[in-house]
C-alpha cells in the first residue's frame, strides 16, 4: 500500500502541503489541469527556497492583479463592506469539478465553515470569506485532493502537529495560537504547543487538510521511497517546512483494524440494507453478510463489520441499535497484504490507470481501474469488456517498468 506520512514539526498550511506534493514529484501543471473546470484564472508559482539549510519547494497560488492571502480566510462579519463570498458561492464554484474531487473539496470547505460558524455563533451560510483568501483556499483544498490522487497515495498518516504558540492578529482582534477556528478543526488530532516558536504554525486551510485527508494519526512502519519538503512563508528558528515521507507499508504492518461479527436470525430482510448503509456512514471499512444455519437448522445471517479500532465502540452501539442483535464477537485480525501501486498504461482508447499488486518483490496481479474503464466505455459507446481487453494488451509494458 502506497502511503504518505506527514511530519508537521513546523506546522502546516495549504501552500506548504502543495509544495510538499510537488517536491515529491507531482507536476503542478497536472494539478492545474484537474482544476480547469473551476473557471478561475490563477497560476502556480513554484520555486525552491532554503529554510535553515533545508531546500524545500514553495508553491504560491497567484491570481492576476490580486494579493496572496491565505493565513486567515474569514472576514469580520460585523463589517459588510468587505468583498467576499459565502459558503453557497464557494460550493457553486467547487461544483464545477468532477467527482470524487468535487465531493471531497466541498466536504472540506463545509468542515471549514462549520468550525468558523461555531466560533462566531453564526450559521454556516453566514460565514463570510475574504474574496482572495477564499479563492486561495479553494485552489489549495481542491489542489490537495487532486495532488494526492496524482501521487497515487492510498492512505495518509500524520505525526503530532506543532501549532506554535503566542498570539496572532486577525480582523476580530488578538487571538491566541492556535486561533479559535483552527483549534476547533484540530479537535481529535494530536498536537503540541511549542513555546519556543512564538507564532502561528497551523493555518485554517492546513488544519482542514489534516482533518479531512489524514486517515490515521500515528507513525507507521514503512519503506521510504521519497522524502519531500514543502516550504512555508516564515523564517523561524526551525526550518519552516512540512516534511513528508512517500513509501509503502510493509506487509507485516498491523492495520489497527477490528472485525466485529454477530449472528442474526430474527430480523426482517428489509432492515439489512439499511443496517449496512448506517454502518458505512459510521466509518466501517467493509460490511458483508453471510447466509448461515444456526442451531435447530434455523436460517440466519452473519453480519461482519471491519473498522478501525477507534471506531469499535461507535460501531457496536450502532449494531445494537439498528439490528436485533444483543451480543457480538470482536476479533483483532493481523492483515497481510500485497504492496499496491498505480501505473498508467497507454491503450487505443487513451491512458488508463491499473493497479499492480506485488508480494515478496514479485508481481502477483494487475487489474484495470474499474471506474476509469467504465467511464471510457460509456463515453465511446463500447462494451466494458472491450476496454478491459485493450488494457490487457498493454499490460506487458507495465510489467517491464515495475
UniProtKB/Swiss-Prot annotation:
Enzyme Commission no: 4.99.1.12
Pfam families: Ni_insertion
Keyword Lyase (UniProt): yes
Reactions catalysed: Ni(II)-pyridinium-3,5-bisthiocarboxylate mononucleotide = pyridinium-3,5-bisthiocarboxylate mononucleotide + Ni(2+)
Top enzyme category: lyase
Chain segments annotated as transmembrane: none
Single Gene Ontology BP annotation: protein maturation
InterPro entries membership: Ni_insertion
Superkingdom of the source species: Bacteria
Keywords annotated in UniProt: Lyase, Nickel
GO function term, MF aspect, one: nickel cation binding
Family: Belongs to the LarC family.
PANTHER family: NICKEL INSERTION PROTEIN-RELATED (PTHR36566), PYRIDINIUM-3,5-BISTHIOCARBOXYLIC ACID MONONUCLEOTIDE NICKEL INSERTION PROTEIN (PTHR36566:SF1)
Function as written in the Swiss-Prot or TrEMBL entry: Involved in the biosynthesis of a nickel-pincer cofactor ((SCS)Ni(II) pincer complex). Binds Ni(2+), and functions in nickel delivery to pyridinium-3,5-bisthiocarboxylic acid mononucleotide (P2TMN), to form the mature cofactor. Is thus probably required for the activation of nickel-pincer cofactor-dependent enzymes.
UniProt name for this protein: Pyridinium-3,5-bisthiocarboxylic acid mononucleotide nickel insertion protein
Amino acid at each position: 500500500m502506497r502511503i504518505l506520512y506527514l511530519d508537521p514539526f513546523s506546522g502546516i498550511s495549504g501552500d506548504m502541503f502543495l509544495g510538499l506534493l510537488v517536491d515529491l514529484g507531482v507536476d503542478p501543471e497536472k494539478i492545474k489541469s484537474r482544476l480547469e473546470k473551476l473557471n478561475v484564472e490563477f497560476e502556480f508559482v513554484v520555486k525552491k527556497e532554503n529554510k535553515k539549510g533545508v531546500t524545500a519547494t514553495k508553491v504560491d497560488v497567484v491570481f492576476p492583479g490580486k494579493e496572496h492571502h491565505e493565513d486567515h480566510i474569514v472576514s469580520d462579519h460585523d463589517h459588510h463592506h468587505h468583498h467576499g463570498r459565502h459558503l453557497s458561492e464557494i460550493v457553486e464554484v467547487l461544483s464545477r469539478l468532477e467527482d470524487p474531487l468535487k465531493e471531497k473539496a466541498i466536504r472540506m470547505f463545509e468542515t471549514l465553515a462549520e468550525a468558523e460558524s461555531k466560533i462566531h455563533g453564526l450559521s454556516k451560510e453566514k460565514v463570510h470569506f475574504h474574496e482572495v483568501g477564499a479563492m486561495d483556499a479553494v485552489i489549495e483544498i481542491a489542489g490537495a485532493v487532486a495532488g494526492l490522487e496524482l501521487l497515487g497515495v492510498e492512505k495518509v498518516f500524520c505525526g503530532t502537529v506543532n501549532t506554535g504558540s503566542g498570539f496572532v492578529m486577525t480582523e476580530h482582534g488578538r487571538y491566541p495560537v492556535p486561533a479559535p477556528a483552527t483549534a476547533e478543526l484540530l479537535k481529535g488530532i494530536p498536537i503540541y504547543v511549542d513555546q519556543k516558536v512564538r507564532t502561528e504554525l497551523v493555518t485554517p486551510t492546513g488544519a482542514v487538510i489534516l482533518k479531512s485527508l489524514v486517515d490515521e494519526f500515528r507513525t507507521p512502519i514503512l519503506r521510504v521511497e521519497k522524502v519531500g519538503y514543502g516550504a512555508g512563508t516564515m523564517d523561524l528558528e526551525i526550518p519552516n517546512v512540512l516534511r513528508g515521507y512517500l513509501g509503502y507499508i510493509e506487509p507485516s504492518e498491523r492495520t489497527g483494524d477490528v472485525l466485529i461479527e454477530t449472528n442474526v436470525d430474527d430480523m426482517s430482510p428489509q432492515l439489512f440494507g439499511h443496517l449496512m448503509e448506517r454502518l458505512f456512514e459510521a466509518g466501517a471499512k467493509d460490511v458483508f453478510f453471510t447466509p448461515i444455519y444456526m442451531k435447530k437448522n434455523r436460517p440466519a445471517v452473519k453480519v461482519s463489520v471491519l473498522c478501525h479500532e477507534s471506531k469499535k465502540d461507535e460501531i457496536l452501539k450502532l449494531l445494537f441499535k439498528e439490528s436485533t442483535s444483543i451480543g457480538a464477537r470482536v476479533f483483532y485480525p493481523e492483515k497481510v497484504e500485497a504492496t499496491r501501486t498505480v501505473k498508467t498504461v497507454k491503450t487505443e482508447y487513451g491512458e488508463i490507470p491499473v493497479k499492480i499488486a506485488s508480494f515478496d518483490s514479485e508481481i502477483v496481479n494487475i487489474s484495470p481501474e474499474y471506474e476509469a474503464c467504465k467511464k471510457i466505455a460509456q463515453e465511446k459507446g463500447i462494451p466494458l469488456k472491450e476496454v478491459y481487453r485493450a488494457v490487457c494488451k498493454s499490460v506487458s509494458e507495465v510489467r517491464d517498468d515495475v
